[in-house]
Design a protein with these regions (language model features):
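Vicinal oxygen chelate
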Residues: 1-12, 23-117, 127-134
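Conserved beta-strand-loop-alpha-helix junction that forms the acyl-donor binding cleft
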Residues: 15-17
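Conserved ATPase active-site switch/coordination loops adjacent to the nucleotide-binding site
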Residues: 120
Length: 134
């Protein structure tokens, strides 16, 4: 792709309360907030990282089509978090306010994995390949 040495995908999660979401992701997944800014309308945009994986959280803006899962009534995207100890990370997310979708278990497709829904409607798969550590 045109001489680029690095290509990254950085999801931007639309939420009803980006400030609260940033705090949740820090507590639940050990995210670090790298930056934060506010638009002229007061909407928050924050850049976070879990390990080396960066993602953004932004207050929803219906006028430009940035809608939260709460507004949409669900989500079609699952975010996969590959970690050494999925049991502990999933439990930490639940303790921070996530809802358990299915528990961390050995799956027939070769992963130890579970799924939680964060308080903002986003689904997180938490796991690792069986027999490996992240």
């Amino acid at each position: 792709m045109g001489g680029e040495s690095t290509i990254k995908i950085m999801p931007m999660l639309s939420l009803r309360d980006a400030s609260r979401a940033s705090a949740f992701y820090q507590s639940a997944f050990g995210a670090r907030e790298l930056s934060r800014s506010a638009s002229g309308e007061g909407r928050i945009v924050a850049l976070l990282a879990i390990g080396e994986a960066e993602f953004g959280v932004v207050d929803e803006a219906p006028q430009v089509g940035n809608l939260s899962p709460e507004t949409l009534g669900g989500t079609s995207v699952r975010i996969s978090l590959v970690v050494a100890d999925p049991d502990a990370v999933a439990q930490r997310a639940i303790d921070a306010g996530a809802e358990l979708i299915f528990p961390v278990e050995d799956q027939p497709y070769g992963w130890r994995q579970g799924r939680v829904r964060d308080p903002f409607g986003h689904h997180w798969l938490v796991g690792r390949p069986i027999g490996e550590t992240a």
